[in-house]
C-alpha cells in the first residue's frame, strides 16, 4: 500500500479511496488483456457497454472520468481536466497512457476537501441518492466488479 503517497489530503478516507481506485483501475487492465488474448466473449445483452471487450474497457474508463467530474461538480471545485476517454475502437492502443493521465488527474482535486463535505447527499447521474464518499466507494468497486466478471468468464471458458 502506498503509505507515503498523497500525504497532503485533509480527509484520510478520501485519500485512501483515491489510492484504492487507482489500484483497482490498474488491476483491471491485465485481466482485460488476458480476456482479450483468450478471446473471451461477453454475455449477449442490449447494453452497448457489453458489445465487445473494447466497449467494456471504454465504459470502465468513461465511468472513472465521470465519477471525478461529478464529485468536483457537487463540491463546487474546478473541472479536474480529465481528457475524454478513448473510443472503443482505439481503447486498446491508448489505454495505458490514458489510465496514467486519468489517475494523475484523480489525485489532485479532493486534497483540500474536509471530511464533513463528503457526507453530503446528491443525486447521481443515474438518479440514485449518494453521499460523495459513497460515490468514491462506488468508483473503487466499479473496476473491481468488471475484473471479477472477466475472471469468471475466463474461468468458465477454461472449464
Model-assigned labels for residue ranges:
Residues 1-22:
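Extreme N-terminal tail/first-helix region
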Residues 1-7, 40-84, 122-159:
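Short, contiguous alpha-helical
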Residues 14-15, 24-27, 54-64, 100-107:
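Short, mixed-charge, low-aromatic patches
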Residues 20-34, 70, 86-123, 130-149:
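Acidic/histidine-rich alpha-helical segments that form the ligand environment
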Amino acid at each position: 500500500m502506498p503509505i507515503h503517497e498523497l500525504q497532503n489530503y485533509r480527509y484520510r478516507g478520501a485519500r485512501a479511496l483515491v489510492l484504492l481506485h487507482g489500484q483497482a483501475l490498474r488491476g483491471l487492465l491485465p485481466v482485460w488483456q488476458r480476456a482479450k488474448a483468450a478471446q473471451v466473449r461477453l454475455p449477449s445483452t442490449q447494453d452497448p457497454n457489453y458489445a465487445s471487450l473494447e466497449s467494456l474497457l471504454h465504459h470502465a474508463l468513461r465511468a472513472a472520468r465521470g465519477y471525478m467530474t461529478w464529485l468536483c461538480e457537487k463540491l463546487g471545485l474546478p473541472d479536474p481536466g480529465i481528457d475524454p476517454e478513448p473510443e472503443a475502437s482505439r481503447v486498446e492502443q491508448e489505454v495505458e497512457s490514458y489510465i496514467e493521465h486519468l489517475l494523475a488527474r484523480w489525485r489532485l482535486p479532493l486534497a483540500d476537501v474536509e471530511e464533513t463535505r463528503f457526507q453530503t447527499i446528491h443525486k447521481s447521474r443515474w438518479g440514485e441518492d449518494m453521499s460523495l464518499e459513497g460515490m468514491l466507494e462506488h468508483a473503487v468497486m466499479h473496476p473491481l466488479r468488471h475484473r471479477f466478471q472477466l475472471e469468471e468468464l475466463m474461468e468458465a471458458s477454461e472449464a
